[in-house]
Amino acid sequence: MIEPEFKDGLLPVIVQDYETLEVLMFAYMNREAFDLTCSTGIAHYFSRSRGKLWKKGETSGHYQHVKEMRIDCDRDCLLILVEQDTGACHTGYRSCFYRTIEGDVVGEKTFEPADVYKN
């Protein structure tokens, strides 16, 4: 296995749908998230804002099943191809990239956040 380089303890990750190649999200992994992703086949990330590890889908049930992991030429960025359950974005869209810079919604809404993220 090619060992990634974690700059300041983090590794940028681009996530794409395995079949359509749609870009679903961008996140970071720390070493623990990387190791858990490799060992479980379910994507784990590190939340910079919350300062903690997170298993994608742990709250929503919208897991990312890892099909393939690719590393860039400098070994400092990952591309993960996943089978996405429902939507990747906490706002209810399939992709976090669901709108243009002008504000036009171009993505597919796949769930209502209020129905999923109940306190």
UniProtKB/Swiss-Prot annotation:
Disulfide bonds: none annotated. GO terms for cellular component: cytoplasm. Keywords: Amino-acid biosynthesis, Cytoplasm, Histidine biosynthesis, Hydrolase, Magnesium, Metal-binding, Zinc. GO terms for molecular function: magnesium ion binding; phosphoribosyl-AMP cyclohydrolase activity; zinc ion binding. It is found in: Cytoplasm. Zn(2+) binds at residues 73, 89, 96. Belongs to the PRA-CH family. HAMAP family: HisI (MF_01021). Homodimer. This is Phosphoribosyl-AMP cyclohydrolase. The gene is hisI.
